[in-house]
Each structure stands twice: as C-alpha cells, then as structure tokens.
Amino acid sequence: MVFTDLIFLFCFLPISVLLTKQIRNIKLQNILLVVFSLLFYAWSNPIYVVLLILSILWNYFTAFELEAQDDKKTKRILLIVSVAVNLFILGFYKYTGFLMDILHIQSNLKIALPVGLSFFTFSELSYIFDVYNGKSKPQKNIILFTLYVSFFGKISMGPIVSYHEMEDQLTNRTLSKAQYASGMVLFSKGLIKKVLLADQLSYVYSILQNNTSTLGVWLLAISYMLQIYFDFSGYSDMAIGLSRFFGFDFKPNFDHPYTATSVQDFWRKWHISLSQWFRDYLYIPLGGNRIDKNTYIRNIFIVWFCTGLWHGANWTFILWGLYYGCLLLLEKFYLREKLEKLPKPISHIYTLLVVLIGWVFFMSPNITTAFSTLGKMIGIGATTFANNQAKFMLKSYFILFVLAILLSTKVYDRIQIFVYNQYKMKAVYTTWTIYIILIIVCIAFIVGGTYHSFLYFAF
C-alpha cells in the first residue's frame, strides 16, 4: 500500500484518523496506531511483517543490554554485534544479488526487498546509537518502540526520524485543528507534486529513454532531475502532513534543493533526514572535521561510499556517492572562496549542472550507459543535435518543464505570501478552492491508472 492508492486515500487514512480522534487516551491511541501500522506494512507482503517484528524485538532487547553494561569494552562489542545484525538483515535482502554478480556466482535466487527496509533499519540503528551514547534511555514500553519503528507515516520511505527526536512525541502529543489544517495542506501539496508533476515527467522520461540526439538526452536528464525531486519531496510532504493528523511533528525533508549555490548547500536541502543521519551517526563518530586533512578526506569518501550504497545495489549508485564526495572535497579545499565571490546566478548554474550530471549516474542501469549519456549531452555519440522525437517532446511538454522548474524554486511560496498579505482570508479561500480542484484532478488520474509508484519505494 502506498499513499496514492485509492484504498489508502479513501479507506485506510480516513478510518485511522477518525478512530484515533475518538480516543482521548494516548496509550490507546498508540496501540491503535501500531495495529494500523502493522496492517499497512502487511498489505503488500504479509510475510515481511514477521521480519519487521523480529527486527524490532532484537533492537528492543539489545538496548537494555547496552545500558546494563558497565564495562566499556563489552559495551562496545555488544554495539558492534547489534549493528552487525541490523546491517546483515539489510545486506542480505538488498545486496545479495549484487554481491553474487561481483563474484560471478550463477543463481536463480530472487530476493525481494522488503518495503522500507533501508529506512526502518536506519531508524533502529539511530535508537541503538542514541542509547549507547546516552542521548536516550531504552524504551521500556514495547508498544512505543514498535510505533517508533513501524509508524506507517514514515516506514516506507522516511523521513528517517532519529529516536531522540521522536521520543517525547510518543507519549506527549496533542491533536489540534491547526495541526489537521497544516497537515491537510502539506498532504495535498505532496499529492499534487506526485500525481500532476512527477508522474507526468515520468512519462516524458520513459518516452525519451532510447533517444540518441543531444537535445533528447538533455531533456531525458532534466525530466528525471525534476521527476525525482517532485516524486520524493511529494512523498515526504504527504508523510509529514499525514503524521500531523496523529499529533506527530517531523522536520521538513526538502528545502528547495535546486536553489542551492554549491554542492554543500544542495545537500543541506536534499533528503535532509538522510544527510543528518550520516552526519550524526557516521561522519561525526569518525572525527568530523576536527582531524588532519588525510583522515578527513578518507572519512568523506567513507560517508559518501555508504550514502551511494544505501541508495541501491549497483555500481552506478556507488559512483554517484563517490562523485559527490569528490565534489565536496573540491569545494572545501579549492572552490569555496571562488564560489562565494561569483555572482549567485553563476554559482547556481554550476550547482545545477553538477547535480544534473550526478542524476545521470543515478538514473542509469550501468556505468557504461551513464558515460554514454554524458557523452551524448556534449555531442559525442549522438546521432544528431535534435531529432523529431526530441523536438516533439520539447514542444508538447514545454509548459510542463517551465512549470516544474518554477515550482522547484521558492517562487510559489513568495507569491503565496504576497497574495495572503494583500488579500488575507480571500486568499485562503481561493487557495483551498484551487487545492480542491487539483486534488479532484489527481484522483481522476489515479482512478484512470495514469500514476506510477514512488521512485524511492525501491530503496
């Protein structure tokens, strides 16, 4: 089940919200949310609920053992074992096929990736690390810990919420009209982003995948660049929005990343929860930036190798991660001062270009295809500059491209603020009217079967 399924939109979500609203006791609310979350997770493949529960139990009991240990060496060994078990589960389901390919092992073994495994594993690891470092006490209530890991608002594709950020909200949260209203706005924005922008860009991308002209390849890369933003930020908006229906308040996962003026700035704005996870639980424990230059360089490559590998079992993802590691090192040691002196439009264009190149690695099925695509973008290997298909797609979807580019910036937010300041309540009524119309259009697309699964659903 995903957020754009009709059964979720018209049955699962309304029923869970209405039932939770009727219950005043937060303990009973939590039990109900656990039931709904496990049902949500079981919908696509019930057998993996067993894996989820076993994973929860392992980390639940391990945390008590960690706190009980006074001997630092024993405690550290227990931490290593706990992390190893979590990573083994993740690795078995996500990387076995990749490893077998590397070792040239022939097998018909097909291992399906459990939904949200990468996300809930990182949530559990954050809990173990928080307990180990003394940021949090072990959660004695198994219901609360299960809710933290399995809450259906974030288990599929995040955001990755650290335990210490959600701990108080598990037992101390309120449901208000303001939360419902802001949650509805955010959920609606996410649905519109996904169905009316990401899915339409997905169609453009699918049509252009075999195009061999320079213009066609540029349109291919740009359509993917915009699609993945609206797809994933749309999901994140829906997740954060619906979480507010139940009193949870999660931090934004995106902050207009395509307005960034450096690669470092881009990663402050893109998939923020993942960036913060790697910063808090890998980069800083490795020494952060308070170390010598060679160790710093090593740590950057470790972090970005892991970031790439987390995204998928393919050399293209690893190369994508290392590519960003190299760019961040270049900016830190050579380009930072130069970028700061450049006019913002120039540094913005630089950032968009290097990010676009990164998405070419990310979207390609293999490294050969990635470099072939990059070659065609500068005319190497392209059959022509612009063939008929590329011209037709540009002409037919020009408005979509322009609209998507504008909406990926802060233009809409600024217009909304200006209009509200000028017209107050009239602006609110008009905005809601537009939202309702667009939501009806979204539902029509979904009913017609012209929507696609979320891209990050595969990660």
Predicted regions and their residues:
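Membrane-embedded transmembrane alpha-helical bundles that form the catalytic cores
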Residues: M1-S408, Q416-A458
